[in-house]
Amino acid sequence: MQKIGIYPGTFDPVTNGHIDIIHRSSELFEKLIVAVAHSSAKNPMFSLKERLEMIQLATKSFKNVECIAFEGLLANLAKEYHCRVLVRGLRVVSDFEYELQMGYANKSLNHELETLYFMPTLQNAFISSSIVRSIIAHKGDASHLVPKEIYPFISKV
């Protein structure tokens, strides 16, 4: 059976921090699924279609990465793909508190599921999609925070 990991997120937009985690975690799995969440409750800046297209462009050089859109429970998605490991990033203490709760909730729904947490590399530690959206909203230049392939998307906003 293939070793599969799932890296879920809203990716609104995808950042260099996300790509760093995709790069490092893709080396641990035969296949890494990047699952773009619908997340209507978060009121995303970019549509699901745009977010999926951005992440596909940004990961096209990764041979073992597949990008999908999903809605519903992550634990169910993991079962569907026969995945036993979720990949998550942790930047700050508040991320840890939230991610720990989510990890336990997912484990309670799918007992075979484990969560693997990645700390960002130093140069990406401060980057978040929220910061990128704020810079964009104030007409600033966020090109150094996102993959070059997606800059045309965010420069239109």
Curated annotation (Swiss-Prot):
Q: Which InterPro entries match?
A: Cyt_trans-like, PPAT, Rossmann-like_a/b/a_fold
GO BP, one example?
coenzyme A biosynthetic process
Q: Which organism is it from?
A: Helicobacter acinonychis (strain Sheeba)
Where are the residues marked Transition state stabilizer as a site?
18
Q: Does the keyword Nucleotide-binding apply?
A: yes
Function according to Swiss-Prot or TrEMBL:
Reversibly transfers an adenylyl group from ATP to 4'-phosphopantetheine, yielding dephospho-CoA (dPCoA) and pyrophosphate.
Give the UniProt keywords, A-Z. Answer: ATP-binding, Coenzyme A biosynthesis, Cytoplasm, Magnesium, Nucleotide-binding, Nucleotidyltransferase, Transferase
Q: Which GO terms describe its molecular function?
A: ATP binding; pantetheine-phosphate adenylyltransferase activity
**Cross-referenced HAMAP family, in alphabetical order?**
PPAT_bact (MF_00151)
Q: What is its main location?
A: cytoplasm
Q: What is its EC number?
A: 2.7.7.3
Functional pathway: Cofactor biosynthesis; coenzyme A biosynthesis; CoA from (R)-pantothenate: step 4/5
Name the record gives this protein: Phosphopantetheine adenylyltransferase
Annotated residues for binding of ATP: 10-11, 18, 89-91, 99, 124-130
At the top level, the lineage of the source is Bacteria
Single GO cellular component term: cytoplasm
Catalyzed reactions per annotation: (R)-4'-phosphopantetheine + ATP + H(+) = 3'-dephospho-CoA + diphosphate
